[in-house]
């Protein structure tokens, strides 16, 4: 079977919402929503191998540490394991006073009773009721009409009131989800929710939660936002209701749908860390939170050690986080492209502490989430001088002059093309060392003696020449380097000279860079590093001289 030439024969677009006076497009998110993690319930039930109790507890502690204040821990009536986990959390004191446990139940009395029993002794708890309301579920799954579906919700809501009254020591919050809300007729979704509200009788001081799931994404995010705004306008007792979002990612727009839903008036967001969940996953709470953070809004969640959080999630879920996953993937703060690397390097050079973050290609400072800058720039065959320069500066304190950056990038490019692999900072430095610092033939500097005479410099150098010969060159000039050039037996023109310190204090070294031409040839660069700046400059000159002569010899051959 292949894709249809006319998909309209099999699929149809989801209808839009008639909301010409919608207001959400002109709004912005100005504060973090109430966060609820469903990792231990919705996320766990979607795993190939669900978490055992030990992993669940480890995950719970991570969520608490991050700052999630409402955590859906399990489906207590589904299994003894889930029931026992809730009991462990309560009896062993794993629920902080500022954190609320949430559990889920279907709309059957035996399951509801079991769910409330699992929460006995909890200081406070959210009990989450759901039943599907969309036309396809009514027709295909339940064979129920609208009244039948509404009756299921209302009868279960009454049972919530009954069983909660038997445990008055717990501060209860009731939550109702018209499952498949986004595929349900809005008038009917409102009708069912209004009926549940009537039973639970919330007040502004004691609110209930209405959770409005995009159980399966069926439309573009703007339609979901229209649904949320319409619902917020029309639901009864809006001031006594917390509107919650629960988006999945079937169309790849769960983040956008949630953000637009918050703009449309929602108060709360349910999801999972890094987007685990059924099928394509629940909305990713980490991305939502850090999207707020990068807009200057406190997300009320702490991902200062994002790699530590990822490690727990990967080990508990036994699923890897994609290397391109926003904010946390191994490659999301990495640039291979030469133009990107150059822009990032320049951005880092200009960025000052306390200023607004404006480094090109990096929407967040990796350091804010516990990332180092070491992986920001990596070098492969697509890389340019910016990335190479950045790595040498950051790892080895070597700042190549601009024209030398261009020359050395060609050397690196040739090596990456030859290897077909990425190069590390250490490999790049080794290549620099081999190409420039070990350029000792045909002339190797052995020693030098410098004297100042009447404001002029006199230099004598001992040089190891070809065939184990020892040469002595002498010259005078206005400075040490000019004196050395004057003493060379070859016509050399210095085009550019740069120097800087590597490190600080007594262990500091000097780096010198020379660009020269030999006998009117093309410019060539050399590098010298030494504790003594004069020695470093002499080494740089010999480096450039030898490289130029070797290139001329190779060209002649």
UniProtKB/Swiss-Prot annotation:
HAMAP family for the chain: LeuA_type2
The protein's required cofactors: Mg(2+)
Pathway(s) of this molecule: Amino-acid biosynthesis; L-leucine biosynthesis; L-leucine from 3-methyl-2-oxobutanoate: step 1/4
Residues covered by region (Regulatory domain): 439-557
Family named by the database record: Belongs to the alpha-IPM synthase/homocitrate synthase family. LeuA type 2 subfamily.
Species annotation: Pseudomonas putida (strain ATCC 700007 / DSM 6899 / JCM 31910 / BCRC 17059 / LMG 24140 / F1)
Keyword terms: Amino-acid biosynthesis, Branched-chain amino acid biosynthesis, Cytoplasm, Leucine biosynthesis, Magnesium, Metal-binding, Transferase
Principal EC category: transferase
Pfam families referenced in this protein's UniProt entry, alphabetically: HMGL-like, IPMS_D2, LeuA_dimer
Transmembrane region(s): none
Keyword Metal-binding applies: yes
Subunit structure: Homodimer.
UniProt binding sites for Mg(2+): 42, 246, 248, 282
Name of the protein in question: 2-isopropylmalate synthase
Role summary: Catalyzes the condensation of the acetyl group of acetyl-CoA with 3-methyl-2-oxobutanoate (2-ketoisovalerate) to form 3-carboxy-3-hydroxy-4-methylpentanoate (2-isopropylmalate).
A single cellular component GO annotation: cytoplasm
Domain Pyruvate carboxyltransferase residue range list: 33-307
InterPro entries reported in the protein's UniProt record: 2-isopropylmalate_synth_dimer, AIPM/Hcit_synth_CS, Aldolase_TIM, IPM_Synthase, LeuA-like_post-cat, LeuA_allosteric_dom_sf, LeuA_N_DRE-TIM, PYR_CT
Subcellular location: Cytoplasm
